Amino acid sequence: MIQQESRLKVADNTGAKEILTIRVLGGSGRRYAGIGDVIVATVKDAIPGGNVKKGDVVKAVIVRTKKERRRADGSYIKFDENAAVILKNDGDPRGTRIFGPVGRELRDKKFMKIVSLAPEVL
């Protein structure tokens, strides 16, 4: 469960290392975001010479959460960290590589480019 002020690891090669959630998109009173939800965030930590720099406001999709999520078949999925992938305005990932596994929920939410770049889909 990601909400305002949540800090997430960045799971791509855009140059950002950590982002801070500004807003959860998808309704005026929406408080929490899970795997496959889009957020607006600011870059808090970045490497020099990267695609994004500290202070940039970006859109990102959540790919891993520590909070368990119940699936339709009754199973639960949770990860060791909260992580996101930075997006372009058209919804495609800004980076060219994805690090670590991503949730299967991304396939249902039509983030096929991220699913194809990911090394593992759980």
Curated annotation (Swiss-Prot):
Per the record, the GO terms for biological process are: translation
- State the GO CC annotations: cytosolic large ribosomal subunit
Keywords from the named record? Ribonucleoprotein, Ribosomal protein, RNA-binding, rRNA-binding
Is Secreted one of the keywords?
Answer: no
InterPro entries, sorted: Ribosomal_uL14 (IPR000218), Ribosomal_uL14_bac-type (IPR005745), Ribosomal_uL14_CS (IPR019972), Ribosomal_uL14_sf (IPR036853)
Its signal peptide is: none
Is Transcription regulation one of the keywords UniProt gives this record?
no
**GO molecular function terms attached to this record:** large ribosomal subunit rRNA binding; structural constituent of ribosome
Recorded family membership: Belongs to the universal ribosomal protein uL14 family.
Question: What is this protein identified as?
Answer: Large ribosomal subunit protein uL14
Q: Origin organism of this chain?
A: Arthrobacter sp. (strain FB24)
Query: What gene name is listed for this protein?
Result: rplN
